Amino acid sequence: MPVALVFLVVLLVLPSAALAQSGAQITISQPAEATTMDPGRSTQVLTVNYFINLYDTLTRWDNTLKLQPGLATSWKQVNDITWDFTLRQGVKFHDGTPLTAEDVKATLDRNIVPGKTVVNSGFTTIGSVSIVDPSTIRIVSQKPDPLLLVRLAQMGAQILPARLTTDDGVKELARRPVGTGAYKFVEWVKDERLVMEANKDWWGWEGKKPAIDRVIWKPIPEDFPRLVALEKGDVDIITNVPPDRSQGIAEGRNTRLLTVPSTRIVNFGMNSTQPPLSDKRVRQALQYAVDVNAIIKNIYAGQGKPIAGSVADVDFGHNSAIKPYPYDPAKAKQLLTEAGYATGVDVTLHAGTGTMVNDKALLEVIASMWSKVGIRGRVEMMEMGARQRMLNDRVVPPNGMLLGNPQSTLLDVDGSLWRIWHPNGFNGKYWIGSQPGQRFHDLMEEARYTLDPKKRKALYAEAIAIRNEEKPSLDLFQEMVVYGTSKRVSFKPRADYRLIVAEMALAGR
């Protein structure tokens, strides 16, 4: 038999896992596929995992959450509000065109124009972006900004080709991304797979070969099929691991469990523009009627800790003196009666399937807890694309609540409170009519431009206390990052939930 024919027969009988290993390929399964390939149009954690492999930012967080150079190799502060950034030379986009200062300027200009992106609130401190010379970008902030360098590493800061930042260009970008990142887009078959291959020319390899040549992202919405796929070796990494299956993965012959405390919190943002949620007492009653510790124990196997003020303890400015609301059904009933709702209120809980582990069960348990004090909670699940549209277009219905697990990508209270709850922030419109007065906004605005860290921390402490009193969201807990993986792949899990394939290694390579 000819050698070529023998080789073909061997290929046909080899198991798929062996072929994947020989080709340095891995498969990652999340419960939902991407909603877009445009980093300016989504901050959803599962979708962001695609962005951070396809694109680069001027600065970047390493896997210990320390800031490092990215597409900018260095920077200097010219004065209190002016920074010059030196761009990395020889970088090319995946379509072969060189990275230019014009691309950087066009990307940042898009982000600072209100309405152009959903990440605008994270960039409003920037006043202007200009080109000093072909290798230097100048950024001038509105006022002294203590967080400018980390803003350039956050969600939405991924640098795009200038031609794809136009109104027509972003439509193309949403379907066929072009970045400078470690992995290039190959194909996207909706509801089936998204494929990337290593960008052999990526500057970050530093002369080394990529450990993984090809990655397939396979959405599997239901928990059980996702677990089975891992156990069979059909996928190498799964996210959103059900807590009650964690031990089985940890003890599996060919699987392991990776965990780390996260920078993300779990809460429900609410549209409190109309009664009854426009009444602070009703919002507080919603919180008192939820047993957060029981949720953590029974739904999440103890993986989490209660939060106060929607701020994670890893964020600069976190105030440990402010405590979470205790579970107090009697207090909840009292507040409802005082507000004139002794017979209860109607509230709808919305969530996108795959937002987080056990999301539907979470909504159902909260609705059950509320029922004990007369709050009638209705559960509405939707596919992730519909959830993203509800979020982006700010169309959570009045007296509706939307499940989220936001994080401050700045690792600072500005990224969690200003970005989301300031009137110019992401959820600002939902707080109309129930704002805690101008004091909260003044505090956050002053802190945003305060260089002295002690003073900024004091401003944040007062703002968090006001927000915790006003309750514009139902605050639950700080998450754990949990992955199930095959033993053929290894990586250090990141607290920021980023699955960066360039940080992974394969056994034997």
Where are the predicted features?
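Ligand-site clamp/hinge motif
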Residues: 201-248, 376
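A structural "hinge/loop" feature
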Residues: 32-48, 71-72, 97, 119-120, ...
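Aromatic- and charge-enriched surface segment that lines or borders ligand/interaction sites
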Residues: 73-117, 132, 138-140, 229, ...
